């Protein structure tokens, strides 16, 4: 059963936070940002849930925790209301920079999230394009990396696993393609979208095609481990 609060954190730190990566690698997203007249820092604050700000400029997107530096803000009365923004495009209540938040949300932000949705939920036809396939898989990787920490910190079942995870740094990645770091400190997980230095545990997939198969459940994790296509090292319990 899905927990609304945990899903709100996944939507913030997993799904929407991938806008950072979308804006860094996707040509359509870059074109949308190129048309911005001025930088916009949009904050979503969820009662009983996450609060984060998305800083957009012509050069890209940066996600930060909290509301510091926001130029416009939208509040949500509950995690369920915030999840409705993701699932049903239902906005919250503008509380700062009302004109800016509404114009940006209905314009550039919607264009960016629509593009992200297309890449994270591709059709079979979309995936026939190799460049699209690779970008889709890479963005899915970053979404999963963010969601891991979101669930570990907020989902009641995942917290049991987090409670037994030792402190340290986990490196995860697709070989020679993309990497993320998951830091564990006092059972709190933090995802950083860069390759780890001196990790305590490592999990690396051999290539993009393998990663796609694992993400979609079309290949066997055990079989690929036995074949040596999934590299694991260090404190394996952290990877588990």
What are these regions (language model features)?
Residues 1-240:
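Feature captures hydrophobic
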